Amino acid sequence: MYSSSSVSKRFVLVPIVVVVTTQLLLVRNVSSLNLTNSYLHHKCVVNQGKYKPGSKYEKSLDDIIQSFSNKDKDSYGFRTGYSMKAYGKEPDMVSITYQCRIDSRGPKCQSCVVTAGYELLRKRCPRYKEAIIWYDQCLVEFSSLDTSGQINYDDNFCMPSAKNLIGNSISLEERLHLLNNLTKIAVTKIDKNIEGIKKPVLYAAGEKRLGTKSLYGMVQCSADLSVQGCNECMLYYIVHFQECWESKQGVRVLSRSCNFRYELYPFISPKGSYYTKF
């Protein structure tokens, strides 16, 4: 981390068995996609200082996290995959933001937010007024400031694959092309899960066949960003971390405001509404 005859009959059957076995494994792998929710990274931010044990700030933080366990308390947020809650006034204001991966909306989103929230509050960054944690399916941020709508250029990290690309098997241009196409879809496709509001989903996933291989990708921006903000965020992080991923078979780049991933294997179910085969 930086801060893809009877003898002849037997010979005919062998490749058939191999193909069928491979297909069964692929079906099983695809059907199990998005079932994991691994911890990825966290950051305790020192700028906003720490709160005192037993303080009003801590109580507000506890109350908000506990409310996430009640599905009726924030059902809209879990259904849409995003929420920003702010309580009190500065310097005692408590702001909690969560963003779930679009294909993890609903119960998966709630489960991830509850797990990540308690992990951040109790284990990773106790007493910090500002902290952020990333899981496979969501991110959760605590803060004493309201930064909604702003691109965060400070809290980010790059997780490249351990495997390098061989030669020019998948060129830099091909990977950039996929990420750019996904970003265009993300900022133009309307979110079908928000009733009465025509808002871009700011998420897209898909795959591109390149010779004998396929390249899989995903992009997402935080729901509080504008279309312009999403475009700017994606461009910034693609360029900012290019040295981290340009020679790698896969990568995850995550920030508070946007993230992207590409791999030489499928990592998101192709059955979703926002999945495209180019």
From Swiss-Prot:
On whether Hydrolase is a keyword of this UniProt record, the answer is: no
Chief location of this protein?
A: secreted
InterPro entries from the UniProt entry? CRR_secretory_protein (IPR050581), GNK2 (IPR002902), GNK2_sf (IPR038408)
Keywords for this entry? Repeat, Secreted, Signal
In terms of CDD domains, this protein maps to: Gnk2-like (cd23509)
Q: Which GO terms describe its cellular component?
A: extracellular region
> Locate the Gnk2-homologous domain: which residues?
39-147, 160-267
* Signal peptide boundaries: 1-32
A Pfam family annotated for this UniProt entry = Stress-antifung
Here the disulfide bonds are none
Location in the cell reads: Secreted
Q: Which PROSITE patterns match?
A: GNK2
The UniProt family comment states:
Belongs to the cysteine-rich repeat secretory protein family.
Record-given protein name: Putative cysteine-rich repeat secretory protein 19
Organism, scientific name: Arabidopsis thaliana (Mouse-ear cress)
